[in-house]
């Protein structure tokens, strides 16, 4: 595809400038991805309703490394903007726990950094992560994608986006102190 470059007053091209600011998405697959995954998970954890629970970076590392080893069933996708990791999604595919012969994808964790969520790029990041999940799920033959939201962060905004991109509301999560 031919791109027409429009010079700016400084002589740089708009396409080159946008290439640095547009989000990119990739599957995480090596230990070099781990610091960004842990950093994003820790920030999201602190902000969420689960922030009172001590964060365990070793558990994040264990989950990510297990996903790296079994990429047919698990994956971590990282969203980057300007060379910095600004979001990620961890998902897996498998059978319904009391069913057989049908694969379902479960989004276990989807996070975007707080600063990116409040910008125009936040929507692009979220949509890119959802598209990545859909593509990955189709490649594995999943029939449905389950998206569970339990963070208690931006619930109305998350609900609106999920509905807009085709997710059907099928229930809710409830919590009570034991």
Which residue ranges define each predicted feature?
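A conserved beta-turn-beta hairpin within the catalytic core of GNAT-like acetyltransferases
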Residues: 95-107, 168-170
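Acyl-donor binding region in acyl/amide transferases
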Residues: 102-163
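Conserved beta-strand in the GNAT
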Residues: 78, 84-93
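A short helix-loop-beta-strand connector motif used in the catalytic cores of GNAT acetyltransferases and
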Residues: 65-78
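Flexible, glycine- and charge-enriched loops at secondary-structure boundaries
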Residues: 30, 53-57, 119-123
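Terminal substrate-recognition subdomain of acyl/acetyltransferases
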Residues: 1-23, 138-178
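A short beta-loop-alpha structural element at the N-terminal edge
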Residues: 22-39
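Conserved GNAT-fold acetyl-CoA-binding loop/helix
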Residues: 45-64
């Amino acid at each position: 595809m031919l791109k027409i470059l429009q010079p700016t007053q400084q002589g740089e091209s708009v396409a080159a400038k946008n290439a640095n600011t547009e989000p990119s998405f990739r599957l995480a697959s090596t230990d070099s991805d781990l610091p960004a995954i842990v950093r994003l998970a820790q920030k999201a954890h602190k902000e969420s309703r689960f922030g009172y629970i001590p964060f365990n970076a070793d558990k994040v590392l264990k989950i990510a490394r297990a996903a790296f080893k079994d990429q047919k069933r698990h994956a971590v996708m990282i969203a980057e903007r300007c060379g910095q990791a600004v979001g990620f999604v961890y998902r897996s595919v498998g059978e319904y726990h009391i069913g057989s012969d049908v694969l379902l994808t479960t989004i276990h964790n989807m996070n975007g950094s707080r600063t990116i969520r409040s910008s125009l790029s936040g929507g692009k990041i979220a949509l890119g992560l959802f598209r990545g999940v859909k593509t990955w799920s189709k490649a594995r033959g999943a029939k449905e994608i389950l998206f569970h939201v339990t963070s208690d962060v931006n619930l109305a905004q998350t609900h609106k986006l999920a509905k807009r991109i085709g997710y059907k509301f099928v229930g809710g999560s409830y919590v009570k102190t034991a």
